[in-house]
């Protein structure tokens, strides 16, 4: 198969089954920047610097979410949901903390929230844009159906592979 043919295939068809089964839903955004090839496919779409940029980013990510649904790719849908959620939380962090720094450098001491910095309103609006799309993802019928099917397939896979964790060992993690 040529590189062009591979690039035109849906990601789910490029991913070995064992790799797909190694994906864990996890809480919130965990794992979003580590699971390839989805990270590389979605990261260029993820932006939140201004409200228009956030609106375009959220729309582009929603379009990918729906495309993954058509392809029957739950992992792609969930990774897209995580990027959308990350857009919401990062924009909110920049709304709450000028410059986006939440903790004092080198410590886990939380810095006070800033009240009136220049970008506060725009970052809050960007966060709301992503939140609306994130809620659509969570409530999406195809997402819910594919999530149940993926978790069941993963439970069976984990059982066959000797209980390598996740569903087979009783550590199912809810998606938020």
Go through each PLM region and give its residues.
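Amphipathic alpha-helical protein-protein interaction segments
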Residues: 54, 70-73
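C-terminal-biased regions
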Residues: 2-62, 82-176
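Inward-facing hydrophobic residues that define packing positions of alpha-helical scaffold repeats
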Residues: 74, 80-81
């Amino acid at each position: 198969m040529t590189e062009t043919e591979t690039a035109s295939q849906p990601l789910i068809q490029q991913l070995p089954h064992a790799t797909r089964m190694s994906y864990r839903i996890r809480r919130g955004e965990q794992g979003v920047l580590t699971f390839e090839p989805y990270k590389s496919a979605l990261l260029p779409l993820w932006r939140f610097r201004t409200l228009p940029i956030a609106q375009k980013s959220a729309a582009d990510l929603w379009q990918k979410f729906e495309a993954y649904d058509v392809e029957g790719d739950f992992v792609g849908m969930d990774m897209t949901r995580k990027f959308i959620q990350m857009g919401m939380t990062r924009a909110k962090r920049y709304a709450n903390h000028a410059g986006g720094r939440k903790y004092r450098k080198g410590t886990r001491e939380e810095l006070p929230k800033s009240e009136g910095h220049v970008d506060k309103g725009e970052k809050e609006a960007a966060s709301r844009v992503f939140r609306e799309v994130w809620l659509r993802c969570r409530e999406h019928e195809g997402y819910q159906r594919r999530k149940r099917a993926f978790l069941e397939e993963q439970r069976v896979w984990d059982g066959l592979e000797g209980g390598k964790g996740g569903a087979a060992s009783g550590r199912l993690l809810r998606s938020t």
